[in-house]
Amino acid sequence: MYCVRKVTNDLYWVGANDHRLALFENCFPIPRGVSYNAYCLLDEKTVLFDTVDWSACRQLLENLAYVLDGRELDYLLVNHLEPDHAACIEEILLRHPKVKLISNEKAFMLMRQFGFHVDGHECIEVKEGDTFSFGKHTVTFVGAPMVHWPEAMVTLDVTDGVLFSADAFGTFGALDGKLFADEVDFERDWLDDARRYLPHIVGQYGPHIQLLLKKAGGVLDQIKYICPLHGPVWRKDLGWFIEKYDTWSRYAPETQGVLIVYASMYGNTENAAQALATSLCDKGMSKVAMYDVSSTHVSQLISEAFKYSHIVLASVTYNLGIYPAMHDFLMDMKALNLQNRTFAIIENGSWAVKSGDLMQKFVNDELKNMTVLNERLSLASSMGTDKRTELEALADAILESMK
């Protein structure tokens, strides 16, 4: 059964929602599901913008058949070749043998690498700055390499001001009928997933996002809709969400606050983390988030690291090293290029306490533009009252560094 939504008078959402997939890219938990967005334009010529994951192909085909209502599909325009958006290309070609493909040189190379039989079809190769008309609608193409694949591009319908943004401005979460961001409480229900999406999907490539935003800045007044390949369509408050992407891709903190991530085997390091959180709140800093590194998926920790200005690493020493799950968190921060944060350290161990020095060395040597506070809380097995002064000094140092 078809499930479509009208975006503009001539444009329809023909994508699908997926609540069956547990791990996006087989890595990231998506308890709220995910959407695969595709769009169909009805003009003198008909155009399908991207396809969907193979698991949702039937839904796409039913949606497309309903919107076309007996018309032929004239063009398939492909902005991004990742299989969750391109897997149905060959099925579209089989069902619409006269369809013409529009994409760029690298995209056509990837189509052939994935084994799509496109050579029997007319392939129209475009590059940045080119325009193409489908009737009253004219589109122009903007390269978006490494946002987050090398072939990625975005397409602007200059007639209606619709930006087909590929994976940029996307988010985890299934739409379930609510296509537009203004139909949901985005800040309450979606922002965390958007922030979790960005660093893991495109966050390593912050400079490339900044380049795309710079390009978009020249036509920002023309953009009335943002149609990403995942998540809601934006038709209101576009500037608010663009500003979020700008903040995240510059690796600037979204808010002044403290993320406390602790690694605790028997609860003693956790107790110290709790004591620090309590002290910070007592001193007026209520924006404090605390997570057990062992029971929290690292993608959630990274999302919070992109949110907060200050990060406290509290780790027990394990085999004369950093606790393994904490080390994984550090490695992910490095891989995803997190920058411009202030760190504080709590270390613990019953003998040969090493975790603090090792965490500080990692932050200093492996991460970029980071500050580590001189104050450190060092514990021997557990936190006693004799350590209260050190803990309060650490809390004061964190708050002082925010001024």
Residue ranges of predicted features:
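Metallo-beta-lactamase
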Residues: 5-9, 103-152, 208-211
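Structural motif
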Residues: 45-47, 75, 137, 161-164, ...
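FMN-binding flavodoxin-like domain, especially the glycine-rich phosphate-binding loop
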Residues: 175, 186-226, 231-233, 275-291, ...
